[in-house]
């Protein structure tokens, strides 16, 4: 590295050789060479420009809730956007920066008596991550409420994408197809009754707590739903609930979750994912595709 990122950006918190297990919801993941925590779009843009100029590999993550970082970690510069978290409501719109928590965004919408985001009340991710994968729950998904998304291109240019340009599909948006980085999102909502909005959010959070193993570290829903099947039922019917590899276990509460019950590693998670895929395919002929984003490098043996 010809220039030191720490010396170049004294105003931005940057950590060297930092374990990403401190930031992922699974509490697993290897070290990142450098982790930066920008607080604004301008700081993020400056970091991207620096990485390009220095030929540094660049990885951007949000709340790391539906993410597995392999035990070998991530080379180059990793940007975590969770300090870019401003949210404001204006008229029937809510604008949220990419690092804002979805849960916090739903609370702002409710406070402004705006309806449409209730389905997301318990989704643990960031706004940017939710757009990246078109997150959804309880019959709703981001594609139904997003108006525009502002991104930084790999060249460091700001660009606004409208709904059609995002080409939303099941757990997919065009953000996955390019190297653009989401920096803010505008949600188009409708006027509603605040009491009813809050009641619906409370109802969904109660449902989520009853059905999902929220008391354990996990990466949320591991697999996409195959057409014509329910993922949890396939895994349950394969007899895999309670199966453990290392410290990773298929949840007894919800078969679609793999939880960290005893100091699991990312390798435990990867081994469990592959095992579940293998058994379900052997039993039912169905290939489970991962919904969780998997990044980073394997541990170098030697």
Swiss-Prot record:
EC numbers:
1.3.1.98
The cellular component terms of Gene Ontology attached to this UniProt record, alphabetical and capped at eight, are: cytosol
Q: Which keywords are on file for this protein?
A: Cell cycle, Cell division, Cell shape, Cell wall biogenesis/degradation, Cytoplasm, FAD, Flavoprotein, NADP, Oxidoreductase, Peptidoglycan synthesis
EC top class, in one word?
Answer: oxidoreductase
- Domain FAD-binding PCMH-type as annotated: residue spans: 27-192
Chief localization: cytoplasm
Q: Does the keyword Cytoplasm apply?
A: yes
Q: Which reaction does it catalyse?
A: UDP-N-acetyl-alpha-D-muramate + NADP(+) = UDP-N-acetyl-3-O-(1-carboxyvinyl)-alpha-D-glucosamine + NADPH + H(+)
Q: Which InterPro entries match?
A: FAD-bd_PCMH (IPR016166), FAD-bd_PCMH-like_sf (IPR036318), FAD-bd_PCMH_sub1 (IPR016167), FAD-bd_PCMH_sub2 (IPR016169), MurB (IPR003170), MurB_C (IPR011601), MurB_C_sf (IPR036635), Oxid_FAD_bind_N (IPR006094)
Give the required cofactors: FAD
TM helices/strands, residue ranges? none
What's an example of a GO molecular-function annotation for this chain?
UDP-N-acetylmuramate dehydrogenase activity
UniProt xrefs under Gene3D superfamilies: 3.30.465.10, UDP-N-acetylenolpyruvoylglucosamine reductase, C-terminal domain, Uridine Diphospho-n-acetylenolpyruvylglucosamine Reductase, domain 2
Superkingdom of the source species: Bacteria
Query: In which compartments does the protein localize?
Result: Cytoplasm
**Pfam families from the entry?**
FAD_binding_4, MurB_C
> Which PANTHER family does the entry link to?
UDP-N-ACETYLENOLPYRUVOYLGLUCOSAMINE REDUCTASE
> What function does this protein fulfil?
Cell wall formation.
Q: Name the family the entry cites.
A: Belongs to the MurB family.
Designated name of the protein = UDP-N-acetylenolpyruvoylglucosamine reductase
Please name the source species.
Answer: Lactiplantibacillus plantarum (strain ATCC BAA-793 / NCIMB 8826 / WCFS1) (Lactobacillus plantarum)
Protein encoded by which gene:
murB
């Amino acid at each position: 590295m010809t220039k030191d990122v720490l010396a170049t950006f004294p105003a931005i918190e940057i950590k060297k050789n930092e374990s990403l297990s401190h930031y992922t919801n699974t509490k697993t993941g290897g070290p990142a060479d450098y982790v930066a925590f920008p607080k604004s779009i301008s700081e993020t843009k400056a970091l991207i420009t620096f990485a390009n100029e220095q030929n540094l590999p660049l990885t951007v993550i949000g709340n790391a809730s539906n993410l597995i970082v392999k035990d070998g970690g991530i080379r180059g510069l990793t940007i975590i956007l969770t300090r870019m978290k401003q949210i404001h409501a204006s008229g029937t719109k809510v604008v949220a920066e990419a690092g804002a928590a979805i849960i916090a965004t739903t609370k702002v919408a409710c406070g402004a008596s705006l309806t449409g985001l209730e389905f997301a009340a318990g989704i643990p991710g960031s706004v940017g991550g939710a757009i990246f994968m078109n997150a959804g729950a309880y019959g709703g998904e981001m594609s139904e409420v997003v108006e525009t998304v502002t991104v930084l291109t790999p060249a460091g240019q700001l660009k606004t994408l409208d709904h059609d340009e995002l080409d939303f599909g099941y757990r997919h948006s065009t953000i996955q197809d390019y190297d653009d980085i989401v920096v803010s999102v505008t949600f188009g909502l409708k006027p509603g009754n605040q009491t009813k909005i809050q009641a619906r959010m409370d109802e969904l959070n109660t449902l989520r707590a009853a059905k999902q193993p929220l008391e354990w570290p996990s990466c949320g829903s591991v697999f996409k739903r195959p057409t014509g099947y329910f993922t949890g039922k396939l895994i349950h019917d394969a007899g895999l609930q309670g199966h453990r590899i290392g410290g990773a276990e298929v949840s007894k509460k919800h078969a679609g979750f793999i939880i960290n019950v005893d100091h699991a590693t990312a390798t435990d998670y990867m081994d469990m994912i592959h095992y579940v895929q293998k058994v379900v395919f052997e039993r039912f002929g169905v290939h489970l595709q991962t919904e969780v984003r998997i990044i980073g490098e394997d541990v170098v043996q030697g």
